Amino acid sequence: MRFLILFLALSLGEIDAAPPVQSRIVGGFNCEKNSQPWHVAVFRYNKYICGGVLLNPNWVLTAAHCYGNQYNVWLGKNKLFQHESSAQHRLVSKSFPHPDYNMSLMNDHTPHPEDDYSNDLMLLRLSKPADITDAVKPIDLPTEEPKLGSTCLASGWGSITPTKWQIPNDLQCGFIKPLPNENCAKAYIHKVTDVMLCAGEMGGGKDTCAGDSGGPLICDGVLQGITSWGSIPCAKPNAPAIYTKLIKFTSWIKDTMAKNP
């Protein structure tokens, strides 16, 4: 499970690490400037850890396996390591990981077939609302299931090489396809459930990877998933990645935001 594993390694080192899962864009390209205005860079202290998605001026959605403390976020960034006048910095006042995510999987351990990374999402409440500009815009939650055959765009600042941690300066984009969950179930020892979305290229070469966790998967212009986990190395043939299937969580997301204005 590449995304989580790499995340753990990052967390324990200069960024922080998680379980056998990880995420980044391999085989992608530099996103057009301000083309992903909902994309958020999530930091712990001054270390980049994950991507995120701006749902409204007060709330960011990311992955539960990015859980920690002392979060802060950057919005409106195209280049992670450069000053940009379009960028906005915000502190996070409170985090809300999904209550059914198994946090014990955050501990490094030997993978088991019963490991279940379902419910991998977390809401971050910003301490100050984001200013909506051309570079910073929210994206709506989905209202229907993603369709097989649609075109999906993943974005992130995750590693751009499959086996070595190489984080890019430019936000990366990559086109992939939603696939039947059976394709992912055949590829992994861990459980693949109906609240997960399988996506990628069966031939390999394009994939999210370590550092992309929590970032958006947008299919035919609709936010359908956030990057959760996959294989190491990334972009292997017959090993597409897993995304949290957001249509399954719209009620929890809306209820959590409404109860914490």
Swiss-Prot record:
<keyword id="KW-0865">Zymogen</keyword>
<keyword id="KW-0645">Protease</keyword>
<feature type="active site" description="Charge relay system">
    <location>
        <position position="120"/>
    </location>
</feature>
<comment type="similarity">
    <text>Belongs to the peptidase S1 family. Kallikrein subfamily.</text>
</comment>
<dbReference type="InterPro" id="IPR018114">
    <property type="entry name" value="TRYPSIN_HIS"/>
</dbReference>
<dbReference type="GO" id="GO:0004252">
    <property type="term" value="F:serine-type endopeptidase activity"/>
</dbReference>
<dbReference type="InterPro" id="IPR009003">
    <property type="entry name" value="Peptidase_S1_PA"/>
</dbReference>
<dbReference type="GO" id="GO:0006508">
    <property type="term" value="P:proteolysis"/>
</dbReference>
<keyword id="KW-0378">Hydrolase</keyword>
<feature type="domain" description="Peptidase S1">
    <location>
        <begin position="25"/>
        <end position="258"/>
    </location>
</feature>
<dbReference type="InterPro" id="IPR043504">
    <property type="entry name" value="Peptidase_S1_PA_chymotrypsin"/>
</dbReference>
<feature type="disulfide bond">
    <location>
        <begin position="31"/>
        <end position="173"/>
    </location>
</feature>
<dbReference type="InterPro" id="IPR001314">
    <property type="entry name" value="Peptidase_S1A"/>
</dbReference>
<feature type="disulfide bond">
    <location>
        <begin position="209"/>
        <end position="234"/>
    </location>
</feature>
<dbReference type="GO" id="GO:0005615">
    <property type="term" value="C:extracellular space"/>
</dbReference>
<feature type="signal peptide">
    <location>
        <begin position="1"/>
        <end position="17"/>
    </location>
</feature>
<feature type="disulfide bond">
    <location>
        <begin position="50"/>
        <end position="66"/>
    </location>
</feature>
<keyword id="KW-1015">Disulfide bond</keyword>
<feature type="active site" description="Charge relay system">
    <location>
        <position position="65"/>
    </location>
</feature>
<keyword id="KW-0325">Glycoprotein</keyword>
<dbReference type="InterPro" id="IPR001254">
    <property type="entry name" value="Trypsin_dom"/>
</dbReference>
<feature type="glycosylation site" description="N-linked (GlcNAc...) asparagine">
    <location>
        <position position="102"/>
    </location>
</feature>
<feature type="disulfide bond">
    <location>
        <begin position="184"/>
        <end position="198"/>
    </location>
</feature>
<comment type="function">
    <text>Glandular kallikreins cleave Met-Lys and Arg-Ser bonds in kininogen to release Lys-bradykinin. Displays trypsin-like substrate specificity and shows activity towards casein, gelatin, fibronectin and IGFBP3.</text>
</comment>
<feature type="propeptide" description="Activation peptide">
    <location>
        <begin position="18"/>
        <end position="24"/>
    </location>
</feature>
<keyword id="KW-0720">Serine protease</keyword>
<dbReference type="GO" id="GO:0008233">
    <property type="term" value="F:peptidase activity"/>
</dbReference>
<feature type="disulfide bond">
    <location>
        <begin position="152"/>
        <end position="219"/>
    </location>
</feature>
<dbReference type="Pfam" id="PF00089">
    <property type="entry name" value="Trypsin"/>
</dbReference>
<dbReference type="InterPro" id="IPR033116">
    <property type="entry name" value="TRYPSIN_SER"/>
</dbReference>
<keyword id="KW-0732">Signal</keyword>
<feature type="active site" description="Charge relay system">
    <location>
        <position position="213"/>
    </location>
</feature>
<protein>
    <recommendedName>
        <fullName>Kallikrein 1-related peptidase b21</fullName>
        <ecNumber>3.4.21.35</ecNumber>
    </recommendedName>
</protein>
